[in-house]
Amino acid sequence: MSNIRPHSLGLKGLIAVLVVGAAPALGADRVTAKELYAEPPTLISLGFEWQIDGDDNHNATVAVSYRKKGSQPWKQGLPLLRLDHEQITENAFHYTTPNMFAGSIFDLEPDTEYECRFVLSDPDGVEGKAENVVIVRTRFEPKPSDSMD
């Protein structure tokens, strides 16, 4: 016969077991910010990818705002789209997306510097840099050559 009583852990022991047991679940739901990348610009748009870890419950978001460099106030952009190992198999493409957010800022002016602000938030918590401000220039409009060569 065992000499361990069924309730020998007590309330403190039960709380410790529940907290330790819940820690991995919370860690997987919390988002960890990794690298933010700017895609090659176009004349009137800028594209971005922000790689992350965690956020297994997909409730993290990235708010986007932008402005011409040095101007006020910030304009609101579309939030970045959440991607998590989606399979892309259109035409000749066979690609699996990383765990990340991605999106674009549209309707910009050619050959202009923009400050772009990205704020990562998650009800479960954010590890790493939750806000990034980057300066990116849209492409200039190509002009035909003056020479006839």
Labelled PLM ranges:
Residues 44-48:
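Structural beta-strand segments of beta-rich domains
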Residues 12-22:
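Bacterial N-terminal signal peptides
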Residues 53-66:
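Solvent-exposed loop/turn segments flanking beta-strands in beta-repeat/beta-sandwich domains
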Residues 25-28, 33:
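Boundary at the C-terminal end of the N-terminal hydrophobic targeting segment
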Residues 63-111:
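Recognizes extended acidic, P/S/T-rich segments that occur
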